[in-house]
């Protein structure tokens, strides 16, 4: 007796374009800026038997947990073919695992990666001093109820930037785009150059924006 086709059903987020943009940014932040140095990037040819998997990006987190973003291709919808890629975002802990939204994933990533305001910045802002740190992952705070201290620091940071020159303002708007450009130039791998200074830390725009996720 012929065995019927078996289906694997998991929650996914549709991605309208190809995954090169996501892969390039991950490799740029891992090998170039070192912001994601601890992250494990697994391309499709190393996944093994899961031929429908385009890539896996594993973010080690605190308390022996990790976040896995798995990209799929060649999926079959109810009719026709799925022309776009999709991703599954899963959070694994010692006791359980669950699928999460991009907003929740941003919060989890920011708990371990990309610097934020330090504890002493509120006192510096009150004294009118220049802030010594800033949040490199502002998108991760959108799903949370921000504290008054955080909102005040964001306003101070924005005012400092507005008083700067035009190059500083353009840098804020196009920071991650330049990162993607550099990533494409280094798509064949980054070779260490002893005479060059390390690149500056990058802002992370958030998963939904990078992947252009369609909810």
UniProtKB/Swiss-Prot annotation:
Annotated segments matching region Multimerization: 154-167
Subcellular localization, as worded in the UniProt entry: Host cytoplasm; Host cell membrane; Virion
Keywords associated with the record: AIDS, Host cell membrane, Host cytoplasm, Host membrane, Host-virus interaction, Membrane, Phosphoprotein, Ubl conjugation, Ubl conjugation pathway, Virion
Residues annotated with Phosphoserine modification: 147
Pfam families per UniProt: Vif
Ranges spanned by the short sequence motif BC-box-like motif, renumbered to the chain: 147-156
Record PTM text: Processed in virion by the viral protease. Highly phosphorylated on serine and threonine residues.
Motif HCCH motif: chain residues: 110-141
Residues with the Phosphothreonine modification: 98
Bias-annotated ranges (Basic and acidic residues): 173-189
InterPro entries from the UniProt entry: Vif
Note, other: Required for replication in 'nonpermissive' cells, including primary T-cells, macrophages and certain T-cell lines, but is dispensable for replication in 'permissive' cell lines, such as 293T cells. In nonpermissive cells, Vif-defective viruses can produce virions, but they fail to complete reverse transcription and cannot successfully infect new cells. Vif-defective viruses show catastrophic failure in reverse transcription due to APOBEC-induced mutations that initiate a DNA base repair pathway and compromise the structural integrity of the ssDNA. In the absence of Vif, the virion is morphologically abnormal.
Family named by the database record: Belongs to the primate lentivirus group Vif protein family.
Name this protein carries in UniProt: Virion infectivity factor
Organism of origin: Human immunodeficiency virus type 2 subtype A (isolate NIH-Z)
């Amino acid at each position: 007796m012929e065995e019927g086709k078996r289906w694997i059903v998991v929650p996914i987020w549709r991605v309208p374009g190809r995954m090169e943009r996501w892969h390039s940014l991950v490799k740029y932040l891992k090998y170039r800026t070192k912001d994601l140095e601890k992250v494990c990037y697994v391309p499709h040819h190393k996944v093994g038997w899961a031929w429908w998997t385009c890539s896996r990006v594993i973010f080690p987190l605190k308390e022996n947990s990790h976040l896995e973003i798995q990209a799929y291709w060649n999926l079959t919808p109810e009719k026709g073919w799925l022309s776009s890629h999709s991703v599954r975002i899963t959070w694994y802990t010692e006791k359980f695992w669950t699928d999460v939204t991009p907003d929740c994933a941003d919060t989890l990533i920011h708990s371990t990666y990309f610097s934020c305001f330090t504890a002493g910045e509120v006192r510096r802002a009150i004294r009118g001093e220049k802030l010594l740190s800033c949040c490199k992952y502002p998108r991760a705070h959108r799903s949370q109820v921000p504290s008054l201290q955080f909102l005040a620091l964001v306003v101070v940071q924005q005012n400092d930037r507005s008083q700067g020159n035009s190059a500083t303002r353009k840098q804020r708007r196009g920071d991650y785009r330049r990162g993607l450009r550099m990533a494409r130039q280094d798509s064949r791998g980054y070779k260490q150059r002893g005479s060059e200074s390390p690149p500056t830390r990058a802002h992370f725009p958030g998963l939904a924006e990078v992947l252009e996720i369609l909810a």
